Amino acid sequence: MNTVKTVRELRAAIARARGEGKRIGFVPTMGNLHSGHAALVTKAAQRADFVVASIFVNPLQFGANEDLDKYPRTLAADQERLLQAGCNLLFAPTVEEMYPDGMAVQTRVSVPNLSEGLCGASRPGHFEGVATVVSKLFNMVQPDLAVFGEKDYQQLAVIRAMVRDLNMPIQIIGEPTVRAEDGLALSSRNGYLTAEQRATAPVVYRTLQQIGDAISRGQRDFAALVADGQAQLAAAGLRPDYLQVRHALTLRPAMVDDRDLVILVAAYLGNTRLIDNLYVHLDEKTA
């Protein structure tokens, strides 16, 4: 696996792969990689002949009081994990390489509607930063396909909409959330948790499961289910940011006759913000 730091080197390496008739897969990351990221690379390697990953902690998607400065940078360990997962090329640019004229004058990409509410409400500007950097990376790599984790459900929806609306010829593949044995969704930010907090954290997924089970049994009072779930999270010592039931494709608030639902949650455990989601499909008997 080669590592390059400039757009020129990146494009030269991809041009060579294209010249050999290879199908290009792409996995954008912010580094501090775990088994969930490895699963994305493995999926890309299954679908493509040449896998490109990027590591870039994107300042545009961090708010003023978020963890940009303390977000872990673990390049050597990340390179080893990417190599083991089947990555062929790593693009690890600097901020100056990505935003040579500075971020203040950078053209922005905004995806309306899907970027609003949920994480977009508590992290204003976040999805504009995500859409902007991903569109730049897509233009640099020009992949045939790109793989994103379903843990960041709203982000995946935003990327799908951007690709569709801007006519980008890229297949977007969602990879199921990778979880620890106790159900906690793997996240680079889990490393911020104390041992006691880590023992508490699986309540997030258990809460989603309980709401999902109730919906599958025919419960349609979504407001009551959400209220119970928020109370359960609070009783465990978490501060819910949001807990909502939405239509799985459009992310509008769920209606009683919807068959494809997603339950989405964000909650603070100490200073660490945990997010997760659970997809629920209802057949005709339960819908």
UniProtKB/Swiss-Prot annotation:
Pathway membership: Cofactor biosynthesis; (R)-pantothenate biosynthesis; (R)-pantothenate from (R)-pantoate and beta-alanine: step 1/1
Name of protein: Pantothenate synthetase
Gene3D superfamilies attached to this UniProt entry: HUPs, Pantoate-beta-alanine ligase, C-terminal domain
Keywords from the named record: ATP-binding, Cytoplasm, Ligase, Nucleotide-binding, Pantothenate biosynthesis
Organism field: Pseudomonas putida (strain W619)
GO cellular component terms, semicolon-separated: cytosol
GO molecular function, one term: pantoate-beta-alanine ligase activity
Main localization (coarse): cytoplasm
Binding of ATP, residues: 30-37, 149-152, 178, 186-189
Compartment(s) of residence: Cytoplasm
Residue positions binding beta-alanine: Q61
Residues noted as binding (R)-pantoate in the record, renumbered to the chain: Q61, Q155
Function: Catalyzes the condensation of pantoate with beta-alanine in an ATP-dependent reaction via a pantoyl-adenylate intermediate.
